[in-house]
């Protein structure tokens, strides 16, 4: 793994960094294919939304792009770039230094090749006990406080279960620990609205746009457990793993249906790779 801090090769930050002390910052995880950052504009748009939500200045786009290009020039053709922006700062207490100053932490790791069976046959998913509590001001963004997902993911260690679904306090399904959820039912594509909590993934937006272009009704709405169990098709997605059908949720089995397959073909695998895509 290659790691830069503020544009220089480094793998440590000061212990007083506010990202470490308070989770005061944002992050993005970007897929790199042959040196190109996929969906870069969408990641930047969410980063900007996060800055507004946290009442922070605009992100340092030019510096981030210079860091990105420098790391990608040294790294593998297919990689995952993680961008962390923290309010560096010093001193004590919750009050931010004025004006806030950014600390840029970027790491580049080789991309993993995910099993083709996950895309062709689907994955097993479970229900999590951990709830996702509402915080509308932070809904949709990728801030550095991710204890909800950490606690949810700690609920199982069975390698055969690929994801867990988290509900809110009202019982509505928010999404997975690392992915957005889609339900196909009665010819429509449904996904949680994420107005109160959750993360609005960059691939989520692409899936919704692709479905609309294919003439499929798309609705952001509250989804219950029963809505999921009575679905015709279920799938999850994120920017690094792509679209993965759900073949089993708890005791209920599903098949990867026509809508999921059409969206997989439209969106494509996470990146072109030998053995991927041909069977979709």
Predicted features and spans:
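Helix-start/capping segments and mature chain N-termini
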Residues: 1-62, 66-70, 86, 92-280
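Ordered, amphipathic secondary-structure segments that act as subunit-interaction surfaces
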Residues: 74-85, 91-92
């Amino acid at each position: 793994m290659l790691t830069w801090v503020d544009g220089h090769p480094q793998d440590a930050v000061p212990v007083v960094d506010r990202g470490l002390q308070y989770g005061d910052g944002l992050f993005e995880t970007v897929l790199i294919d042959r040196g190109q950052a996929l969906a870069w504009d969408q990641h930047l748009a969410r980063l900007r939304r996060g800055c507004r939500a946290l009442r922070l200045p605009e992100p340092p786009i030019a510096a981030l792009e210079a860091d990105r290009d420098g790391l990608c020039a040294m790294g593998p053709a297919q990689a995952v770039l993680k961008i962390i922006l923290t309010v560096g700062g010093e001193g004590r207490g919750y009050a931010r230094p004025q004006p806030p100053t950014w600390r840029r932490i970027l790491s580049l790791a080789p991309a993993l090749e995910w099993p083709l069976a996950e895309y062709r046959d689907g994955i097993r998913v479970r229900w999590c006990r951990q709830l996702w509590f509402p915080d509308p001001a932070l809904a949709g963004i990728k801030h550095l406080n991710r204890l909800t997902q950490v606690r949810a993911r700690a609920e199982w260690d069975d390698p055969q279960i690929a994801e867990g679904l988290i509900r809110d306090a009202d019982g509505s399904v928010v999404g997975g620990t690392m992915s957005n959820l889609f339900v196909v039912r009665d010819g429509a594509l449904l996904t949680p609205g994420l107005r109160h909590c959750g993360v609005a993934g960059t691939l989520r937006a692409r899936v919704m746009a692709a479905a609309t272009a294919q003439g499929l009704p798309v609705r952001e709405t509250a989804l219950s457990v029963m809505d999921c169990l009575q679905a015709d098709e279920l799938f999850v997605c994120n920017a690094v793993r792509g679209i993965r059908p759900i073949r089993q949720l708890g005791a209920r089995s599903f098949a990867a249906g026509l809508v999921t397959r059409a969206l997989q073909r439209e969106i494509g695998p996470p990146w072109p790779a030998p053995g991927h895509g041909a069977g979709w």
